Amino acid sequence: MDYEALLDRIMRTVDAEAYLPLADVVPAEHKAALDEIGQALQGAHFDPAALRARVIQLQKLGQLDRVAMYSALHVIAAHPRVNNLEEAAAMAAQQEMAALEEGGPRLQANLASVERHRGVIAFMKGHTDLALDYFSRAFERQRAAGNLANVLACLLRLGDQAEARDLLRQVRGAFPAELTAALDDMIHKDPDLALLRTETPA
């Protein structure tokens, strides 16, 4: 892995004047529907088939667009209790086509979501280096804490703690405070990032 190239790709996206906190924000018109889906996914006994049907219904009701629908269907398929990664990959491909057809001002954000979903599949299949590339591309498209957290998790999974700590220190010195605060919060909550907790404020 060419870490210098990886760090360069990430750090080249730094521009505090142009910072747009997109990745962890959803369009207002989708928020209620996505909150409902998120709560169902966290339930102890969620029914994948019923939730898929509900997602499709929400799209027909106009509460989700096609991009968000396919994204949600991917998340259901990739859920550990479902673990249908072929379906998850198919939904990511459909999401990409829907994003390209829709275009518009959210195109980069929508494509970043596709990159994240593909990164999740690669990560779950044990291809951590490939997942790292997907997550890095997601961050290039959409500068937000969630995308950086995925990059750091991959570095840690690969055993590259020094590189992860170096990246975190560089990010802390270059990125807007709201992004680093959100990233610190994720580090304290996500067990995949636990090895970085000594690098964050208490």
Where are these regions (language model features)?
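TPR-repeat structural position
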Residues: 16-19, 45-48, 85-86, 128, ...
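"A position-specific structural signal for the A-helix of alpha-solenoid helical repeats
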Residues: 31, 35-38, 53, 70-75, ...
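TPR/TPR-like (Sel1-like) alpha-helical repeat modules
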Residues: 152-179
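Start-of-helix signal in alpha-solenoid helical-repeat scaffolds, especially tetratricopeptide repeats
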Residues: 3, 30, 48, 65-71, ...
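Conserved positions within tetratricopeptide repeat
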Residues: 20-23, 48-52, 68, 89-90, ...
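Hydrophobic/aromatic side-chain positions at a characteristic register within alpha-helices
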Residues: 14, 41, 59, 80-81, ...
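Flexible helix-coil transition and linker loops at the boundaries of alpha-helical arrays
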Residues: 21-25, 48, 55-68, 83, ...
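Alpha-helical adaptor scaffolds
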Residues: 70-140, 146, 157, 170-173
